[in-house]
Amino acid sequence: MSKRESSKYKIDRRMGENIWGRPKSPVNRREYGPGQHGQRRKGKLSDFGVQLRAKQKLKGYYGDLREKQFRAIFAEADRRKGDTSENLIGLLESRLDAIVYRAKFVPTVFAARQFVNHGHVTVNGVRVNIGSYRCKAGDVIEVREKSKQLVTVLEAVSLAERDVPDYIEVDHNKMVATFGRVPTLSDVPFPVVMEPHLVVEFYSR
């Protein structure tokens, strides 16, 4: 387990929410942040604080993305025609690691990034080892033959705690997924409320 994967519950505690809907999340048992003094009562957040928290939650959900990387994704979303917040979600959900996670080939988004980086996945028959690789509608994502018996994959496929969204078609017997379309915010099965419009406000200050 990577250090970034092991930090996933710290993100839950910091946000005070079970952002991936995991049964073992510590916030299912307590209502305070990480650290010895997490029990301290929090004051009301300012508008800036609310916007920052929305950004940190969305950034954390997709594997605790680096700020520089997340800002670049936002900048592209802002350049595109249409609603910037919807563009942002579409770009994040088009990432290869996000699709591997959504397809239930791995248990966590952190594991998805590592899985892709280690060369276990192909896109349209070509091995891709970059988690941020942007998939297009119609792309076929497959777990490589020699990787299909990995314990991590077999355990993830058997999990019933999350459903595959309808914009991804998956054959778990063959471990093949087709990215049907770029989703909108309402399509994405977030376990908690995500507010990308507040992220837009944060970067538009």
UniProtKB/Swiss-Prot annotation:
Alphabetized GO MF terms: rRNA binding; structural constituent of ribosome
Record GO cellular component, one term: small ribosomal subunit
Keywords: Ribonucleoprotein, Ribosomal protein, RNA-binding, rRNA-binding
Pfam annotation, one family: Ribosomal_S4
Domain of life: Bacteria
All copies of domain S4 RNA-binding, residue ranges: 94-157
Chain spans, region Disordered: 1-46
Gene3D superfamilies: Ribosomal Protein S4 Delta 41, Chain A, domain 1, RNA-binding S4 domain
CDD domains per the UniProt record, alphabetical: S4
GO biological process, one term: ribosomal small subunit biogenesis
Basic and acidic residues: bias regions: 1-16
Summary of the function given for this chain in its UniProt record: One of the primary rRNA binding proteins, it binds directly to 16S rRNA where it nucleates assembly of the body of the 30S subunit.
NCBIfam families: PRK05327.1, rpsD_bact
Subunit record text: Part of the 30S ribosomal subunit. Contacts protein S5. The interaction surface between S4 and S5 is involved in control of translational fidelity.
Family of this protein: Belongs to the universal ribosomal protein uS4 family.
Name of the protein: Small ribosomal subunit protein uS4
